[in-house]
Amino acid sequence: MVDHLLPVDETFSSPKCSVGYLGDRLASRQPYHMLPSPISEDDSDVSSPCSCASPDSQAFCSCYSAGPGPEAQGSILDFLLSRATLGSGGGSGGIGDSSGPVTWGSWRRASVPVKEEHFCFPEFLSGDTDDVSRPFQPTLEEIEEFLEENMEAEVKEAPENGSRDLETCSQLSAGSHRSHLHPESAGRERCTPPPGGTSGGGAQSAGEGPAHDGPVPVLLQIQPVAVKQEAGTGPASPGQAPESVKVAQLLVNIQGQTFALLPQVVPSSNLNLPSKFVRIAPVPIAAKPIGSGSLGPGPAGLLVGQKFPKNPAAELLKMHKCTFPGCSKMYTKSSHLKAHLRRHTGEKPFACTWPGCGWRFSRSDELSRHRRSHSGVKPYQCPVCEKKFARSDHLSKHIKVHRFPRSSRAVRAIN
């Protein structure tokens, strides 16, 4: 079947196609063009997947396989068996014959691809990468490393900022004068200013500092204060140290006013037990200063401080002053000032509309009170005798009757 197609004296040199090479070609899922083989010119249905042509025809070894599978392996075996049959019949062409005119290298050089395909491979630049502008595409590992480095930097900066704030507060409090607590023998405690200073702790720092447009800061200072035991009390226990109890004195500076929170020592009911707790005043109360700039003695547990001038905005509440000569009254509302000026001018714009009544008043509340005399309405009632009055001042006078009975008043008049 094959001899009549292939002359005996014509030699077919088969390149040595190793099994590994065929496997690589099969593994790469790329379509290749198949050349018609002289073996498949007959009416047989099986076409050879790999054909070796002569150098004149410039053919090459091609593997006709879409992917590794049992069909591809079967086609390779059929091709090998057909080549073995040709080698045994002709005696001149075999798979293992190495005397062919075309060697493996020359066959590789003479191979010409029939089908052109374009592949996009990544370009690896050997030069400097900074010269070429390309988008930055970080990997997940690089992103994680970047986030970890930033978090570590923030954690390191946080304690540094906190320490800076503490240093700033300490510098502000260090420049201020501090009050010292001197307990007395009777158990009372007083707060005295330091020599050469008239203000409490924290007042100097608030006054000397630059004025800010924002909210006024609140400075807190804690000072250790030695509190001795009261006179007449013996040692609490034999093992107790003779040193006194140390508590903290709190200095508060709020809007330019400094307060010192004085501790209050609560004596223990049982002298055999040591006093471990010191109670401080629950509610701070600002005491008025006594004398020129000096702080007077205050009761234990109270908040004693120097009172600074009030805000000038509070003095502007009564800004409407009477301009009549000899009158110095001031009012918070302009309407009240106008009603007051009518008393000086004698103007009475509010007239009673009751028939036959020509009374006029300078204030509207006086007119309302006058109308009750015509209508008979008495909205003010005595809670004791349930007597009603049209005016509130009449009710106030009536209540005095119940406080001082007539009999007692008569007795006092006789005496």
Curated annotation (Swiss-Prot):
Q: What does the entry state regarding organ or tissue expression?
A: Expressed in aortic smooth muscle cells.
Family matches, as CDD domains: KLF15_N
List the residue ranges of the region (Disordered). 172-216
Q: PROSITE patterns annotated for this entry?
A: ZINC_FINGER_C2H2_1, ZINC_FINGER_C2H2_2
Provide this UniProt record's keywords sorted from A to Z: Activator, DNA-binding, Metal-binding, Nucleus, Repeat, Transcription, Transcription regulation, Zinc, Zinc-finger
The molecular function terms in GO held by this entry are: DNA binding; DNA-binding transcription activator activity, RNA polymerase II-specific; DNA-binding transcription factor activity; RNA polymerase II cis-regulatory region sequence-specific DNA binding; transcription cis-regulatory region binding; zinc ion binding
The annotated regions of Basic and acidic residues compositional bias extend over: 181-191
Q: Where in the cell is it found?
A: Nucleus
Against InterPro entries, the record matches this protein to: Znf_C2H2_sf, Znf_C2H2_type
Zinc finger C2H2-type: from-to = 320-344, 350-374, 380-402
Q: Tell me, according to the record, the phenotype of the null mutant.
A: KLF15 null mice are viable, but in response to pressure overload, they develop cardiac hypertrophy and fibrosis.
Here the disulfide bonds are none
What's the entry's take on its domains?
The 9aaTAD motif is a transactivation domain present in a large number of yeast and animal transcription factors.
The annotated subunit structure for this chain is: Interacts with MYOCD. Interacts with EP300.
The free-text function statement in the UniProt record for this protein reads:
Transcriptional regulator that binds to the GA element of the CLCNKA promoter. Binds to the KCNIP2 promoter and regulates KCNIP2 circadian expression in the heart. Is a repressor of CCN2 expression, involved in the control of cardiac fibrosis. Is also involved in the control of cardiac hypertrophy acting through the inhibition of MEF2A, GATA4 and MYOCD activity. Is a negative regulator of TP53 acetylation. Inhibits NF-kappa-B activation through repression of EP300-dependent RELA acetylation. Involved in podocyte differentiation.
For this entry, the protein name equals Krueppel-like factor 15
Source organism of this protein record: Mus musculus (Mouse)
